Every structure is written in structure tokens, then in C-alpha cells.
């Protein structure tokens, strides 16, 4: 019984953290849209498109946490792994670790899953 409760709690913690991080990193996503401000006169470089796509992948991963946990974890890890090393600057490790916390909780939940 205890492992079932632990498993369920860890999954809910991961989902709630995903929602909170969706809003946190979503605000930065909206702010990064300013990179496209001069789109009409001069389109942004390819790297800007790639980084924005990686950021969007991260955000979609947070939303997928409510539907498909394994897909969510994959999207969160890919999005964070591509986005933060290039955009995070000297704090990239901290940003990346913060971003993948829901994935860590999902891994812990899967490890605590009761034997069937």
C-alpha cells in the first residue's frame, strides 16, 4: 500500500511541477519571441529558429506530463538538453537542472512502481 501511495504522490508532484515550470519557462518563451521582432525586414538566423523550437519542445513536454508521461520525459530532456547549453549562459546547468525536475520525479515514480 505504501509503495502505491509513494508512486502516486511522485507522479502528482511531477505533474504539478510541470505545470509550474510551464508557466515559468513559458514567460521566457514569450520574451524570446522578441528575437523575431524584425522578421519582416530581416529573418532571424537559423540558430534562433532551432533554439525557439527546442524551447517549444520543452514547454510541450510539460503539457504532455498530464497525458503521456514517457513522451513528456523524452520531450523535456530533449528540449532542455538542446536549449539551455546554448542560451543559458553561465547558469545553464542550474536552468537545465530546474527544467528537468519533473522528469526526475517521473523516473522516481517509475522506480517505485509496485510489482504486479
Give the label of every model feature segment.
Residues 1-7:
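Short, Lys/Arg-rich, polar N-terminal cytosolic tail immediately upstream
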Residues 7-17, 23, 36-37, 93-116:
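Alpha-helical transmembrane segments and their immediate juxtamembrane flanks
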Residues 21-30, 77-91:
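Aromatic-anchored segments of alpha-helical transmembrane domains
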Residues 30-35, 71:
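Membrane-helix interface motif
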Residues 33-44:
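Membrane-interface helix termini and inter-helical loops of multi-pass transporters
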Residues 46-55, 94-99:
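Alpha-helical transmembrane segments of polytopic membrane proteins
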Residues 55-62, 76-84:
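Hydrophobic, membrane-inserted alpha-helices
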Residues 62-74:
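Membrane-helix interface "capping/anchor" motifs
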Amino acid at each position: 500500500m505504501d509503495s502505491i501511495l509513494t508512486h502516486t504522490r511522485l507522479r502528482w508532484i511531477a505533474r504539478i511541477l510541470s505545470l509550474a515550470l510551464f508557466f515559468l519557462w513559458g514567460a521566457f518563451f514569450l520574451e524570446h519571441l522578441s528575437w523575431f521582432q524584425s522578421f519582416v525586414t530581416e529573418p532571424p538566423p537559423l540558430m534562433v529558429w532551432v533554439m525557439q523550437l527546442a524551447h517549444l519542445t520543452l514547454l510541450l513536454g510539460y503539457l504532455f506530463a498530464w497525458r503521456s508521461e514517457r513522451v513528456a520525459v523524452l520531450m523535456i530532456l530533449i528540449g532542455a538538453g538542446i536549449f539551455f547549453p546554448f542560451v543559458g549562459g553561465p547558469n545553464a546547468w542550474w536552468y537545465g537542472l530546474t527544467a528537468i525536475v519533473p522528469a526526475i520525479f517521473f523516473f522516481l515514480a517509475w522506480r517505485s512502481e509496485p510489482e504486479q
